[in-house]
């Protein structure tokens, strides 16, 4: 089953996490690149001109702001992070940013998906489509995922990882995520006391 972009948010006995996967049929020549406080989705070497074909293929997919990790499938990662940095709650930052930026104005009306998790275990996940906006709380000790296609409502999922590398690997092709086609690249942030970032 093809779900497009996928993200997961939650916590387990080892810590809190956000994870992101690019699945793509149109622009498969992308990679994730880690920086000290963020992970970006960028074209692979030799495909830099793809950004002129679509404004939606290069963006920060994860950003760390204070004690919160933000994850999304587009430029709204930065908007959400900036709202949280200004003092807004996670729930309100997700809701306002998704509502303001709306779904992507491409041929597919691609939804914007987003999530965030704080070191205290508070986590939210959300989506905006052409006909709905959802922001749900993820209970402590649980994980939920959402995707741009097919699975456009938050779904509880067993997510097995003890660090950021394992979280990135898990959303790429482990557990339930192994059933979803066209994986391209993935990334994750994981924290027990401090956020660490990994990308594949």
Predicted features by range, described:
Residues 1-200:
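Conserved short alpha-helical segments that host acidic/polar catalytic motifs at enzyme active sites
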């Amino acid at each position: 089953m093809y779900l497009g972009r996928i993200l997961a948010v939650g916590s387990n006995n080892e810590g809190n996490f956000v994870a992101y996967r690019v699945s793509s049929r149109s622009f498969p020549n992308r990679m994730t690149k880690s920086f000290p406080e963020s992970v970006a989705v960028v074209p692979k070497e030799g495909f830099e001109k793809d950004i002129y074909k679509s404004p939606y293929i290069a963006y920060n997919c994860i950003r760390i702001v204070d004690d919160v990790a933000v994850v999304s499938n587009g430029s709204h990662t930065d908007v959400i992070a900036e709202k949280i940095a200004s003092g807004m709650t996670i729930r309100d930052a997700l809701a306002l940013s998704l509502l303001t930026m709306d779904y992507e104005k491409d041929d597919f009306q691609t939804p914007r998906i987003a999530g965030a998790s704080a070191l205290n275990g508070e986590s939210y996940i959300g989506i905006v489509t052409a006909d709905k906006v959802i922001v749900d709380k993820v209970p402590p000790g649980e994980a939920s995922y959402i995707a741009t296609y097919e699975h456009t409502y938050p779904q509880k999922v067993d997510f097995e990882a003890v660090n950021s590398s394992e979280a990135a690997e898990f959303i790429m092709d482990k557990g339930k995520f192994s059933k979803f086609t066209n994986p391209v690249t993935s990334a994750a942030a994981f924290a027990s006391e401090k956020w660490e970032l990994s990308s594949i």
